[in-house]
Swiss-Prot record:
It catalyses: ATP + H2O + 4 H(+)(in) = ADP + phosphate + 5 H(+)(out). The lineage of its organism: Eukaryota, Viridiplantae, Streptophyta, Embryophyta, Tracheophyta. The keyword Translocase applies. This is V-type proton ATPase catalytic subunit A isoform 1. It is an enzyme of class 7 (translocase). Disulfide bonds: none annotated. Its EC number is 7.1.2.2. Catalytic subunit of the peripheral V1 complex of vacuolar ATPase. V-ATPase vacuolar ATPase is responsible for acidifying a variety of intracellular compartments in eukaryotic cells. Belongs to the ATPase alpha/beta chains family. Keywords: ATP-binding, Hydrogen ion transport, Ion transport, Nucleotide-binding, Translocase, Transport. GO terms for molecular function: ATP binding. V-ATPase is a heteromultimeric enzyme composed of a peripheral catalytic V1 complex (main components: subunits A, B, C, D, E, and F) attached to an integral membrane V0 proton pore complex (main component: the proteolipid protein). It comes from the Eukaryota. GO terms for biological process: proton transmembrane transport. It comes from Psilotum nudum (Whisk fern).
Length: 30
């Protein structure tokens, strides 16, 4: 939540309607 608040521009909307931080996605992929 902190990341989304600090970097709203890094938030992406997924096809299922959820919003996830690009940073979080990168961490999950890595």
């Amino acid at each position: 939540a902190e990341v989304l608040m600090d970097f709203p521009q890094l938030t992406m909307t997924l096809p299922d309607g959820r919003e996830e931080s690009v940073m979080k996605r990168t961490t999950l992929v890595a």
